[in-house]
Amino acid sequence: MNNIIDGKKLAEKIIMKVKAETTKLRNNYKIQPGIAVIIVGNDPASQVYVTSKSKKAEECGFFSIKHMISKETQEKELLHLIATLNSDPQIHGILVQLPLPDHINTNRITQAIAFQKDVDGFHYINIGKLAANALEDAIIPCTPAGAMMMIEQQCGQDLSGLDAVVVGRSNIVGKPMAALLTAANATVTIAHSRTRDLDDVCRSADILVTAIGRPQMIKKDWVKNGAIIIDVGINRIAAPEKGVGKTRLVGDVDFEEIKEKAAAITPVPGGVGPMTIAMLMVNTLKAAARLHNLPIPKF
């Protein structure tokens, strides 16, 4: 169906531009963007994510380094590593793979990263810049940035007159997503687990972004005809049709039910996921340009 938004295809276009801009930086200024990824412990899902991020960085022509450290690592040791990377001129982006072990304070770690190198966009300074609509100067969290690019592809950059509903209020997706939609002149509602009549709220949306981590919660009768649906949820459910103990990935939206009704919809997998990694590359490239006081590439 031609209303399915192909995240892989859009991400590939972005990566092609990142490669071209990286080549310009290297040829014109002798600068190679550098990213450091830190993973604490050996969680299999985290290992997969980190490997894919590192491979994509190398594909873009970045200097990429992985720090894989024991789950017994103490917080002060991790803080020391971050301080070292903060002062390393070869590194323009620092990413700590979440979740962290329970004995490490996640907030303390994310705030220890220099805001100029905070390519996840989690530092309070970057959050504040986004809230203040200083988008040119902020590092924007990767998933909302990628989702917003998909929305712009469908609706253009000015969302005046459109009602947007964001289901989920996390600092990683929900809140920054709402800020980006507001900056684009949409009328925005943030809904969450405590929202009364959530189905009615969702039905009001011209643009519906879901980030709640509830498999296939959003049903066909929750969505208006012709809505744009961006499904950020990644949920693993049993797939007995594949065999005993097998699973499959689904979003927060019942995709098969809703795809005929939506004007455009992202699949899971293959929707927002590839865009998240592409925007991490964009953030690293922009951070390198900004740290060297060079013009910031446009995407």
UniProtKB/Swiss-Prot annotation:
Catalyzed chemical reaction(s): (6R)-5,10-methylene-5,6,7,8-tetrahydrofolate + NADP(+) = (6R)-5,10-methenyltetrahydrofolate + NADPH; (6R)-5,10-methenyltetrahydrofolate + H2O = (6R)-10-formyltetrahydrofolate + H(+)
Gene Ontology MF, one: methylenetetrahydrofolate dehydrogenase (NADP+) activity
Positions in coiled-coil regions: none
EC number: 1.5.1.5, 3.5.4.9
Binding site for NADP(+): G168, R169, S170, S193, I234
InterPro entries assigned: Aminoacid_DH-like_N_sf, NAD(P)-bd_dom_sf, THF_DH/CycHdrlase, THF_DH/CycHdrlase_cat_dom, THF_DH/CycHdrlase_CS, THF_DH/CycHdrlase_NAD-bd_dom
Keywords: Amino-acid biosynthesis, Histidine biosynthesis, Hydrolase, Methionine biosynthesis, Multifunctional enzyme, NADP, One-carbon metabolism, Oxidoreductase, Purine biosynthesis
Assigned GO CC terms: cytosol
Pathway where it operates: One-carbon metabolism; tetrahydrofolate interconversion
GO BP, sorted A to Z: L-histidine biosynthetic process; methionine biosynthetic process; purine nucleotide biosynthetic process; tetrahydrofolate interconversion
Family statement: Belongs to the tetrahydrofolate dehydrogenase/cyclohydrolase family.
Function as written in the Swiss-Prot or TrEMBL entry: Catalyzes the oxidation of 5,10-methylenetetrahydrofolate to 5,10-methenyltetrahydrofolate and then the hydrolysis of 5,10-methenyltetrahydrofolate to 10-formyltetrahydrofolate.
Subunit-structure text: Homodimer.
Protein name: Bifunctional protein FolD
Organism the protein comes from: Bartonella henselae (strain ATCC 49882 / DSM 28221 / CCUG 30454 / Houston 1)
